[in-house]
Amino acid sequence: MATKQRKVTQKKSRRKVQRGVVHILATFNNTLVTISDRSGLVIASSSAGACGFRGARKGTPFAAQTASEEAVRKALDYGLKYVDVMVKGPGAGREMAIRALQQLGLGVTLIRDVTPLPHNGCRPPKKRRV
């Protein structure tokens, strides 16, 4: 029986990305942080749930900060230096996630709120009676 010859291939090199976009989705229940390059290819992502927070703790500002730090640490391997920040949602973790980006040494060049606002579109759900 013939033995298989293995091909020796080079490891795919990591592409260098200096400028990127950070998308922060802050809901009342969780915070998601996604870092991509300018064309939209995702480099790194994290969420409060992926960082080990469960239940009501996922919606806290500290959980958002932890998720943001973890995503930035992954993205720094690609040589990321400057980012535009797009924030969506009404959650508690909006400001803390942006602050965590700045603390880890990323240059924030732009902060834009991209929360969708209806121009009186769909009828909202009925009011809660507690």
From Swiss-Prot:
Name the domain of life this protein comes from: Eukaryota
Gene Ontology biological-process entries: translation
Q: Which UniProt keywords apply?
A: Chloroplast, Plastid, Ribonucleoprotein, Ribosomal protein, RNA-binding, rRNA-binding
Gene Ontology cellular component list = chloroplast; ribonucleoprotein complex; ribosome
Entry-linked InterPro entries: Ribosomal_uS11, Ribosomal_uS11_bac-type, Ribosomal_uS11_CS, Ribosomal_uS11_sf
Per the record, the similarity remark reads: Belongs to the universal ribosomal protein uS11 family.
Q: What's the name of the protein?
A: Small ribosomal subunit protein uS11c
Q: Which organism is it from?
A: Ostreococcus tauri
